[in-house]
Amino acid sequence: HLCDRRQRQMCIRDRYKNTFLFYLPRLCEHCLNPACVASCPSGSIYKREEDGIVLVDQNKCKGWRMCMSGCPYKKVYYNWTTGKAEKCIFCYPRVESGLPTVCAETCVGRIRYMGVMLYDADKIKDLASTLDEGDLYEAQRQIFLDPNDPDVEAAALEAGISHDWIEAAKASPIYKMISKWKIALPLHPEFRTLPMVWYVPPLSPIAQAVDVGKLSMKGFIPDVQSLRVPMQYLANLLAGGNVKPVVEALSRLLAERTILRKYSDNAGTSQFLTCEILPEQLQGIEEINELKALGLTVQDVCDMHRLLAIADYKERFVVPSANRNTEAAVLMQGSQGYNLGGGEDMRRRADSLFGGPMNRKIIPLFEEYQRAPDSTQGGK
């Protein structure tokens, strides 16, 4: 039996690269403890208090490029034309208007979600100081607050968080996947930057091996622990090497899919596809004890299927608009705007590394732009 198990593991491992495609969209994590902010000598990188987005102040950036080496995810880039650092801005103008990011909205697989998470900022230092890398996932999950808790809601209002943002946190799909169902995991938590972009681990090739009858069943749920090679691979990627949270997340996903597949045949395919199966129809199922062991209820199974399979636009993206009533944004209309590729405005403001005038040429974006006068030659 042990020999057969090892042969099965070797077979799945050898065929892993040929039978399983795992596309991992790696973008800026907009961390709670961003290393790029700490490594910038000029202090040009900052994390916004109102929404947690990490941005680069182009007027302060001096091109030291220490943020590039400081970011463990390598998501800060250097613009050789402007001499400035650039990174993902999380589409903050769209987020301020209550819209999702472009990458999330244009995802054809509809696998990206956006929402509000409330957290205790006073615990960040203790969390980042956790000794065991395997405990970092659970430690970061504990920093998130329950928006439905009256004490948390009162503290949020006292801290200046608007009522709209609190209501958005209650309806956040991110909170459900991270804190309620525990099916989302952070990317490389051992970096200790506390990333805020989390990932739901893939079911393949685990589920594929189950479908063809290569794995044993543990109750009604396939025994995912028999595949230690994929488990450890995903654990090193998403849980700091701790296999337990990965096994639990995949077990919950497999339980949801197994139950919905089994009982959708009785309810009809149309009801399964539109999630019209009511929790009352699943109350007497024989798998109720296994669900309790996984920390799930029948309502959780229906909600998971709704959110992960057929959720609409408003369910996947719960983004409240920013409250900027005190700013006169209308005064900026008609200006040049976000210009980092050259242009007359950029050439007149271009500085060298140490604050003096930059004498090198910057190719303009349009031919009709006139060349900026050279101050060293007394041009006007």
Report residues per predicted region:
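A structured beta-alpha segment of the ubiquitous adenosine-cofactor-binding alpha/beta core
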Residues: 13-21, 25
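Short acidic DE-rich linear segments
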Residues: 377-380
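Active-site-proximal loop/turn and secondary-structure-junction residues that shape catalytic pockets
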Residues: 44, 77, 118
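Long, compositionally biased charged/polar accessory segments in the mid-to-C-terminal portions
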Residues: 109-375
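Single conserved hydrophobic/aromatic residue that forms the stacking wall/gate
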Residues: 1-12
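Cysteine-centered iron-sulfur cluster-binding motifs in ferredoxin-type domains/subunits
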Residues: 7, 22-43, 50-74, 83-106, ...
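Basic, glycine-/proline-tolerant helical and adjacent loop/strand elements
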Residues: 16, 49, 80-101, 111, ...
